[in-house]
Amino acid sequence: MNENVLNKLKILAESAKYDVSCSSSGTVRSNKPGMLGNTVGGWGICHSFAEDGRCISLLKVMLTNYCIYDCAYCINRRSNDLPRATLSVSELVDLTMEFYRRNYIEGLFLSSGVVRSPDYTMERLVRVAKDLRTVHRFNGYIHLKSIPGASRELVNEAGLYADRLSVNVEIPKEENLKLLAPEKDHKSVYLSLIHISEP
């Protein structure tokens, strides 16, 4: 694996671990005397449950942890001084396929900071899922996080390739959202939910 991509993976897996949509996010626990096994974390492997109840391993990563927003509750907020990285669509597709072929994962959990605009970011997420499905014939699980403010068309297209779409409803009330994320629009969060629920 390319060292540059590996470094990006470390940064973006670390940034993704704060999204609690997966059951585990890279717990590290060393083997203890009298105990069996250990866990290895920090590489973006998390566990979730499939519809049939099976526990599946997912590559949990962000496309980028750069963000145009400065939400007080988010580790990836614009003003936070942390290592930043961006994977290209092809880097993430190749990484997913490499992990899948090695049986490290059974699927992908993909989110992203917002760069340029919600539509620009959502279009890149859709391209990852589309390339996995159509170019690489990937039959694993894909969970995409919808970007609040993205167009209905892009959310609908994402639904053609993802097994699951979700959106973070950060704050349920407009006045509270404005206190913690003044650049965000409460309506755009709920519109994303509506777009996802449309047939």
What does each of the following model-derived ranges do?
Residues 61-90:
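Canonical Radical SAM [4Fe-4S] cluster-binding loop centered on the CxxxCxxC motif
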Residues 79, 114-117, 149-151, 169-186:
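Conserved radical SAM core fold
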Residues 58, 110, 167:
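Conserved, mostly hydrophobic/aromatic
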Residues 81-93, 120-127, 134-158, 164, ...:
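Canonical radical SAM enzyme core domain
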Residues 192-199:
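Residue-level detector of conserved catalytic or cofactor/ligand-binding positions
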Residues 1-66:
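Flexible, acidic/Gly-rich N-terminal and inter-domain linker regions that tether
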Residues 107, 164-173, 193:
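Non-cysteine beta-strand/loop elements that form the S-adenosyl-L-methionine
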Residues 109-127, 179:
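Conserved glycine-rich "GG(E/T)P / GGGxP" loop and the immediately following alpha-helix
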